[in-house]
C-alpha cells in the first residue's frame, strides 16, 4: 500500500441507523480510503486487503470500546458517540477482511478497555455483539474477544450524593477474573529500546486507574515490560479503528494511543511520575494536605486486588464553571504517558509470534480514524461531541496522528510523541480540494496546545 494518508470529508457524513447498509456514506468513505491507499479502482472483484494478507491469515480489528459507564454515571448518547468507535466502520472492514482471508482465516474483533469497563454490556449496547452474531450466521470466521484476563468491577455503595457543590461517592473495586485470550499471553521486555530508558523518574512511575498496583514490577533498572495477548502476536494484520478525540493526559488519543487497548496488565502502563515540577509530573504544584488526602482516598487497597474508593469531586455542572485541580499527571507537562504510547507501538509492531523483539516489523497496521463524530474537551471519557464528518486512514500511524492533530487545530510539536515528525515528510490525498481543519476545545490544563 502507498505511504500516504487518505482523507474523506463530507458535510453529510453520518452514521447509518443500520450498520449493514451497503449504500451508507460511511462505506463510501471507507472505500475511498482503501482505494487511495491501494491505488486500485473499486469494482465487484475488488479485494482491498488482499495486498496485505493472504488466504488463511489472521486479522485483528481493534476499535475503541473504552466503556459505556464512567464509574457513577452512564455516558449519554452524544458522549457515547464522541468516545467510542461507531459500529458502521466495523461492518465493511469485516467483509473486506473475509474476502482477503477466506473460510480458513480468522477475524477477531478485540479490545482491552479500561479496567472497570464491562465488556459484554459495552459491545451489546454499541451493537457490536449483534454484528458479530449476524456474520457468524453467514459463516464468517469472526470472533469477539475481551483481551483482559481480569477486570476491576466498581460496586457503588453511595452514588453521586450531592453535598453542596460536591458529589460524594463510596464504593468498592472488586477484582474479577476473565477468560481472557484463548491463545494465552506473552511478556515483552524492551530493555534499552524503551522510551523510558535512562528516565530519571523510573522508581516513581505510576498507573492512574482503579488498580492500586504500581508498575515497578514491570519497569525497573533497564527492564521495561509489556504484556500482550498471543492473538495479537499471531496476527498478520491489525486494523486499528481509533476515535478522534482529546485526552487529558496525552493531549490527543488517535491511532498510536489506541494500541494501548491491545495490552493486558494495565497496571504495567506508566501514566505519570509521582511528584511535582522538578521531581515528577503528577501535580503542577506542591499539593496541599487536602489534595493529598483526596488522592489517597481515591483508591485504598484492601487485599487480593480489591480496593475501596471514596471520591467527592465537585459536581459536573460546577466543574464546567471552575478550573479542576491537576492530579495523576493530567496536564500539558506530563512527561510519562507519551513514552508508554511509543513503547506499546514498538511492542505491537516489532514483537514476533514468540514474544521476542525483532529488528523489523512483524505485522502490518492499517489505521482508520473515526472523526465523523469526534470528542473534544476533557477526554477521553469526559469528551463532548464535535461533528467533524471526516475519516482518515493510513499505514503510517505516526504520520496519521500528526496530520489528525494538525486538523484538530493543535500544535503537533506540543504532543511529545510527535515532536520528531516533520510535516514535509507527510503525503496525503483528500476527496475535497482543501484539507479540512477544525478548532477542538482542549482538555483542561492543555491550553498550550494552540501555541505555535
Regions found by a protein language model. Give the residues of each.
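Extended, low-polarity segments enriched in aliphatic/aromatic residues
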Residues: 1-452
Amino acid at each position: 500500500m502507498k505511504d500516504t494518508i487518505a482523507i474523506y470529508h463530507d458535510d453529510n457524513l453520518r452514521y447509518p441507523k443500520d450498520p449493514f447498509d451497503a449504500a451508507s456514506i460511511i462505506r463510501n468513505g471507507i472505500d475511498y480510503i482503501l482505494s487511495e491507499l491501494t491505488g486500485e479502482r473499486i469494482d465487484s472483484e475488488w479485494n482491498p486487503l488482499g495486498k496485505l494478507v493472504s488466504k488463511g491469515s489472521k486479522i485483528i480489528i481493534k476499535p475503541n470500546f473504552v466503556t459505556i459507564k464512567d464509574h457513577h454515571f452512564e455516558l449519554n448518547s452524544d458522549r457515547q458517540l464522541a468516545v467510542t468507535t461507531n459500529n458502521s466502520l466495523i461492518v465493511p472492514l469485516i467483509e473486506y477482511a473475509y474476502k482477503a482471508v477466506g473460510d480458513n482465516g480468522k477475524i477477531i474483533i478485540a479490545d482491552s478497555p479500561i479496567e472497570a469497563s464491562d465488556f459484554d454490556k459495552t459491545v451489546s449496547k454499541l451493537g457490536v455483539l449483534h454484528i458479530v452474531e449476524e456474520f457468524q450466521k453467514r459463516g464468517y470466521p469472526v470472533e469477539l474477544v475481551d483481551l483482559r484476563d481480569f477486570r476491576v468491577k466498581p460496586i457503588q455503595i453511595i452514588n453521586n450524593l450531592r453535598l453542596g457543590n460536591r458529589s460524594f461517592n463510596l464504593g468498592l473495586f472488586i477484582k474479577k477474573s476473565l477468560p481472557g485470550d484463548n491463545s494465552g499471553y506473552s511478556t515483552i521486555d524492551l530493555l534499552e529500546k524503551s522510551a523510558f530508558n535512562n528516565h530519571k523518574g523510573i522508581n516513581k512511575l505510576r498507573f492512574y486507574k482503579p488498580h492500586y498496583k504500581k508498575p515497578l514490577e514491570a519497569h525497573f533498572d533497564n527492564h521495561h515490560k509489556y504484556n500482550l495477548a498471543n492473538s495479537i502476536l499471531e496476527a498478520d494484520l491489525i486494523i486499528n479503528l481509533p476515535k478522534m478525540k482529546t485526552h487529558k493526559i496525552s493531549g490527543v488519543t488517535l491511532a498510536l494511543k489506541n494500541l494501548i487497548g491491545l495490552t493486558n496488565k494495565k497496571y504495567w502502563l506508566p501514566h505519570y511520575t509521582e511528584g511535582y515540577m522538578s521531581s515528577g509530573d503528577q501535580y503542577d504544584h506542591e499539593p496541599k494536605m487536602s489534595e493529598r488526602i483526596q488522592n489517597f482516598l481515591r483508591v485504598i487497597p484492601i487485599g487480593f486486588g480489591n480496593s475501596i474508593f471514596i471520591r467527592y469531586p465537585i459536581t459536573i455542572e460546577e466543574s464546567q464553571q471552575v478550573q479542576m485541580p491537576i492530579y495523576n499527571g493530567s496536564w500539558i507537562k506530563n512527561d510519562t504517558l507519551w513514552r508508554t504510547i511509543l513503547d506499546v507501538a514498538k511492542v505491537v509492531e516489532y514483537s514476533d509470534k514468540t514474544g521476542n523483539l525483532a529488528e523489523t516489523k512483524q505485522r502490518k497496521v492499517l489505521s482508520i480514524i473515526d472523526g465523523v463524530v469526534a470528542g473534544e474537551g476533557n477526554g477521553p471519557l469526559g469528551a463532548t461531541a464535535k461533528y467533524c464528518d471526516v475519516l482518515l486512514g493510513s499505514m503510517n500511524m505516526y504520520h496519521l496522528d500528526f496530520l489528525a492533530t494538525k486538523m484538530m487545530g493543535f500544535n503537533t510539536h506540543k504532543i511529545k510523541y510527535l515532536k520528531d515528525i516533520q510535516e514535509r515528510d507527510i503525503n496525503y490525498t483528500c476527496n475535497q480540494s482543501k484539507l479540512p481543519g477544525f478548532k477542538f476545545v482542549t482538555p483542561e490544563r492543555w491550553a498550550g496546545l494552540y501555541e505555535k
